[in-house]
Amino acid sequence: MDSLQDTVPLDHGGCCPALSRLVPRGFGTEMWTLFALSGPLFLFQVLTFMIYIVSTVFCGHLGKVELASVTLAVAFVNVCGVSVGVGLSSACDTLMSQSFGSPNKKHVGVILQRGALVLLLCCLPCWALFLNTQHILLLFRQDPEVSRLTQDYVMIFIPGLPVIFLYNLLAKYLQNQKITWPQVLSGVVGNCVNGVANYALVSVLNLGVRGSAYANIISQFAQTVFLLLYIVLKKLHLETWAGWSSQCLQDWGPFFSLAVPSMLMICVEWWAYEIGSFLMGLLSVVDLSAQAVIYEVATVTYMRHSHHLAYTAHVARIPLGLSIGVCVRVGMALGAADTVQAKRSAVSGVLSIVGISLVLGTLISILKNQLGHIFTNDEDVIALVSQVLPVYSVFHVFEAICCVYGGVLRGTGKQAFGAAVNAITYYIIGLPLGILLTFVVRMRIMGLWLGMLACVFLATAAFVAYTARLDWKLAAEEAKKHSGQQQQQQRAESTATRSGPEKAVLSSVATGSSPGITLTTYSRSECHVDLFRTPEEAHTLSAPTSRLSVKQLVIRRGAALGAASATLMVGLTVRILATRH
């Protein structure tokens, strides 16, 4: 296991020796490299979340019920759809960055294809829940009128789910190659379309919440199509795309071994905040509206892993952009077996976000009385927001640090640890404490955020301790597997073993009591074949890496499609039966 001193040379100079011991050598250069990478990603995330902010602003000025409906609709879509897809696709952060840093760059295209297939399958069970939005919300004692409007929004949003998944996947495909500006351009296009669509559908045609949902769908399609066309027309795929390959149907096991922990790492945290929204809905429309406004404030200041409104409470733009940048830099360095650079990127990213989050947290506290006016005219909501924002400003500092550590974990392929930490801190500590303070102590929305503050503080401590003891050399070895380098080597050895002779050399060798026996030996420049190897040994050496046959692929992938389709049919059946009663 490599210590900080073993892996990253430290700069002991300067006027503050104690501080310099924490700063790796080359910190300044690495910090600017991270900012150059994360800067466009920051803009991209701002533009992406602006779509939801604009929609919320339009609906917020329609009334409390409309604002609450949009908030719940987006929360429901997040919990039951976007969070799952974004979590599973986060495996691509590990696989794509490490593959692009390795000599096997074409493997990035295979990962893109594999990820697209997996995410499309995920849409089917998510849609099953979307069909029953109103009934689920009523089970949680949500307001009937709010639940009805929420169902309208979610039903309209159904075709937008695979579009969001594809857009997220294309963005990861580019950013893990250090290509960032096309995402910004697509975000500009999406926001322009969204602004015009919201004005036309909500303000002019008076379609209300339904108009906002239609505007959201239109803008999602516009920016996704633009990004896809940009990649093709500018030929950004040439270095990593070798065409459609049946290999994307192989190796789903290793993909899910990263995808499931990635999903849990994100979703257990994401769901905790969405549960907070549902809890606020149990209190009053004012508390729920205040929660929505705080989420939006968080969107502008923090922004984390995904593309949706309600996730904004624990997401802040700059930390998210820096987290992605750290993930890319760490993953590419490990793919190239450069552990020194990988750890330098990790340490530099964490130190940078500490300073940035302190500045942002201070600004939030200073502007606590002004921020609420941006999103609503309701004085009760504005007053409640101003009370909670000081707590959120402290929360933001620790959550921002956790966000960047999440990038380190994704870059190293250690999402399983992140999932475990989030599950414990949010569901065993944070949420129970928040519920206790909210409903028993009667602190209402303030109690929820105090519970979340305790949660992120403990999570930060766990991430710091874990990464300080991380074995970076082992992580580099694992990166070889993720990037397909070991499989390539094994296939090359297998092919060399099975190939015919490159040339024959006749020689006389003495074999025991029979001197002068002439044997023909075969040799290749890259390997030497032992003619005396037993059949079992030869089979062991020449056996290719585990690949499924065509029959096995049809059975297994067909079973996956059948299971996903069956889930959708169950959801449709439940909706029909529930509607009749």
UniProtKB/Swiss-Prot annotation:
Transmembrane regions: 34-54, 67-87, 120-140, 154-174, 184-204, 213-233, 254-273, 318-338, 347-367, 381-401, 421-441, 445-465, 558-578
GO CC terms of this entry: apical plasma membrane; plasma membrane
Keyword Kinase: no
Extracellular side: 55-66, 141-153, 205-212, 274-317, 368-380, 442-444, 579-581
InterPro entries: MATE_euk, MATE_fam
Annotated stretches, region: Disordered: 481-513
Membrane topology: Multi-pass membrane protein
Cytoplasmic side: 1-33, 88-119, 175-183, 234-253, 339-346, 402-420, 466-557
CDD domains: MATE_eukaryotic (cd13132)
Keywords, sorted A to Z: Antiport, Cell membrane, Membrane, Transmembrane, Transmembrane helix, Transport
Any one GO MF annotation of this record: antiporter activity
Location of this chain's protein in the cell: Cell membrane; Apical cell membrane
Any one Gene Ontology BP term: organic cation transport
Catalytic activity: thiamine(out) + H(+)(in) = thiamine(in) + H(+)(out); estrone 3-sulfate(in) + H(+)(out) = estrone 3-sulfate(out) + H(+)(in); creatinine(in) + H(+)(out) = creatinine(out) + H(+)(in)
Pfam family, one: MatE
Keyword Membrane: yes
Protein family per UniProt: Belongs to the multi antimicrobial extrusion (MATE) (TC 2.A.66.1) family.
Role played: Multidrug efflux pump that functions as a H(+)/organic cation antiporter. Mediates the efflux of cationic compounds, such as the model cations, tetraethylammonium (TEA) and 1-methyl-4-phenylpyridinium (MPP+), the platinum-based drug oxaliplatin or weak bases that are positively charged at physiological pH, cimetidine or the antidiabetic drug metformin. Mediates the efflux of the endogenous compounds creatinine, thiamine and estrone-3-sulfate. Plays a physiological role in the excretion of drugs, toxins and endogenous metabolites through the kidney.
Protein name, per record: Multidrug and toxin extrusion protein 2
Annotated gene: SLC47A2
